[in-house]
């Protein structure tokens, strides 16, 4: 497995992976728009590749103060094989090089499987309330 930065030729395969892993994502998370918006800011999209196929991806961000993991996706056939962990560690290292000292993420409170995954990587549940509003 190789982890590398997203390249334009990855776009269609990344969108397919996203749809497969996040079939119930709301319409405001439509992957082609999210990818375009993310690339306009930075190139913190990482691809896990095996034998020329995209098997996972991680989208991260850095606002100059905190780092964020926005999405980690691994194809069903490769889950629990270390791909997700490797992607997260790669993203964290890239953020660290940029000067980031803390990485945040948000997951649904009911998603216990993903909570366990992130805890295994050193993340802890913080006493925070996440709020949001749609403006567009």
Where are these regions (language model features)?
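Conserved acetyl-CoA-binding loop-helix of GNAT-fold acetyltransferases
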Residues: 80-93, 120
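Short acidic, glycine/proline-enriched helix-loop-strand junctions
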Residues: 113-127
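Charged catalytic carboxylate motif
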Residues: 13, 86-87, 113
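Acetyl-CoA-dependent GNAT
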Residues: 5-71, 75, 94, 125-128, ...
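Conserved beta-strand-loop-alpha-helix junction that forms the acyl-donor binding cleft
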Residues: 105-114, 132-136
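Active-site acidic-Proline motif in GNAT/NAT acetyltransferases
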Residues: 75-81, 109-110
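Extreme N-terminal starter segment of soluble prokaryotic enzymes
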Residues: 1-2
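Conserved GNAT acetyl-CoA-binding A-motif
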Residues: 95-107
């Amino acid at each position: 497995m190789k982890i590398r930065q997203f390249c334009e030729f990855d776009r269609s395969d990344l969108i397919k992976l996203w749809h497969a892993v996040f079939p119930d994502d709301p319409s405001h998370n439509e992957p082609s728009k999210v990818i375009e918006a993310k690339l306009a800011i930075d190139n913190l999209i990482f691809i896990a590749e095996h034998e020329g196929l995209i098997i996972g991806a991680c989208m991260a961000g850095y606002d100059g103060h905190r780092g964020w993991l926005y999405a980690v996706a691994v194809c069903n056939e490769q889950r629990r094989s270390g791909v997700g962990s490797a992607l997260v560690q790669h993203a964290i290292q890239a953020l660290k090089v940029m000067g980031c000292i803390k990485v945040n993420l948000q997951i649904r409170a009911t998603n216990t499987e993903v909570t366990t995954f992130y805890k295994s990587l050193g993340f802890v549940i913080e006493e925070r309330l996440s709020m949001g509003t749609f403006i567009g």
